[in-house]
């Protein structure tokens, strides 16, 4: 599972406030909600919650990519997350 591969990214100390840990938790919640919504397609409240969690994770990933691009690339590689499309004006 993803949890085992993530242990190498974050040391064993208490890092519950780190961006990587928060993105990891949001990713686990997203995967659980996605599997739930495959069974319960009309659960609109869960769909709304999923969209909120996706937005929070997207904002955290944008912050991490601005602050430390190397850690960002490692994290999306470890968690198997697609890199979001960037808007160009």
Curated annotation (Swiss-Prot):
GO terms for cellular component: chloroplast; ribonucleoprotein complex; ribosome. GO terms for biological process: translation. Its main location: plastid. The keyword Plastid applies. GO terms for molecular function: structural constituent of ribosome. Keywords: Chloroplast, Plastid, Ribonucleoprotein, Ribosomal protein. Gene3D superfamilies: S15/NS1, RNA-binding. InterPro entries: Ribosomal_uS15, Ribosomal_uS15_bac-type, uS15_NS1_RNA-bd_sf. It is found in: Plastid, Chloroplast. The keyword Cell division does not apply. Part of the 30S ribosomal subunit. Belongs to the universal ribosomal protein uS15 family. PANTHER family: RIBOSOMAL PROTEIN S15, BACTERIAL AND ORGANELLAR, SMALL RIBOSOMAL SUBUNIT PROTEIN US15M. This is Small ribosomal subunit protein uS15c.
